[in-house]
UniProtKB/Swiss-Prot annotation:
PANTHER family: RIBOSOMAL S SUBUNIT, SMALL RIBOSOMAL SUBUNIT PROTEIN US5M. One of its GO terms (cellular component) is thylakoid. Belongs to the universal ribosomal protein uS5 family. PROSITE patterns: RIBOSOMAL_S5 (PS00585), S5_DSRBD (PS50881). The keyword Transit peptide applies. It is found in: Plastid, Chloroplast. This is Small ribosomal subunit protein uS5c. It comes from Arabidopsis thaliana (Mouse-ear cress). Its main location: plastid. Pfam families: Ribosomal_S5 (PF00333), Ribosomal_S5_C (PF03719).
């Protein structure tokens, strides 16, 4: 039989051991006696092949056997205050923004799936992504002091040094509250956005008050110059509008002037014309101020 042959091979292996083996003679005798015992034990056993008639297969007509068909499922009563969990196919009551905020508080900003210059971009949602820009620094909040900003000019300038040329951007910005206060600023930076921001700060440091009448025009004529630029300003009747061009028009509109005439002479330089406009405005005076200096009432000012 197969079992007897396997045991006989085992006994033969145990008997033909090498002389260099570390096994003692007593252990060898015990192995031989054990193998002979197995031969006598299993030599009397005979293997019988099972036939197909010896097996029986039972098929249930009903999917539920009789044992469990009559059993009624009776779950225990839920305790007081128990809230059943939602089903897997039911949506959450939280909004996407609440889920995103909770995720950000626990795990920090999520990976947007985009990379720039070999660096992963971590952003929470589309709103934050638009405000910060992909791969860029987050935008700074604008200064809310009632002043509006208008860019007059942005130019690229270079500075020649020993090592080569240094490229920068120069921006001219006019700020005003359209209530008689206006300022002109100029600054340079390596980026356009930084140059505009620095120019706006410089313009806020040089605020000038523009005297106006109740018709939103100048009280009288005035002229101003800055370098080679010369600007003439004239009052206008209601409904005329601002008739001027270039930097002069921007300065007058940001100051809140609605009816005025302006003319720039001598130079087309935007910065010099803007500063010449401020110089002309600073020479204007209100009628009541002149009457107060002279010590007379305003009715006698034109006598």
């Amino acid at each position: 039989m197969a079992t007897a042959s396997a045991l006989s091979s085992l006994s033969s292996l145990s008997l033909h051991t090498r002389t260099s083996s570390l096994i003692s003679s007593s252990s060898t005798k015990s192995i031989v006696s054990f193998s002979s015992f197995l031969n006598r034990r299993f030599s009397s056993l005979t293997l019988v092949k099972a036939s197909s008639t010896d097996t029986e297969t039972i098929f249930f007509e009903d999917e539920t056997p009789e044992i469990t068909a009559n059993v009624v499922f009776d779950p225990p009563i839920a305790p007081e205050g128990f809230v059943s969990p939602p089903y897997f196919d039911e949506g959450s009551d939280e909004t996407e923004e609440e889920i995103a905020t909770a995720f950000e508080e626990l795990y920090g900003p999520a990976y947007s799936g985009e990379s720039m210059l070999g660096k992963d971009i971590y952003v929470m949602d589309s709103k934050h992504k638009k405000s910060s820009g992909i791969g860029g620094k987050p935008k700074k909040d604008k200064i809310r002091d009632g002043f509006e900003e208008r860019v007059v000019q942005v130019r690229r300038v270079t500075k020649v040094v020993k090592g080569g040329k240094q490229l920068k951007f120069r921006a001219i910005v006019v700020v005003g509250d359209k209530q008689g206060n206006v300022g002109v600023g100029c600054a340079k930076a390596k980026e356009v956005v930084a140059a505009v921001q620095k120019s706006a700060i410089d313009a806020r440091r040089n605020i000038v008050q523009v005297p106006m009448t109740k018709y939103s025009t100048f009280p009288h004529r005035s002229e101003g110059d800055y370098g080679a630029a010369k600007v003439m300003l004239r009052p206008a009747s209601p409904g005329t509008g601002v008739i001027a061009g270039g930097a002069v028009r921007i300065v007058l509109e940001m100051a809140g002037v609605e009816n005025a005439l302006g003319k720039q002479l001598g130079s087309n330089n935007a910065l010099n014309n803007a500063r010449a406009t401020l110089a002309a405005v600073q020479q204007m005076r209100q009628f009541r101020d002149v009457a107060q200096e002279r010590g007379i009432p305003m009715e006698e000012l034109w006598k």
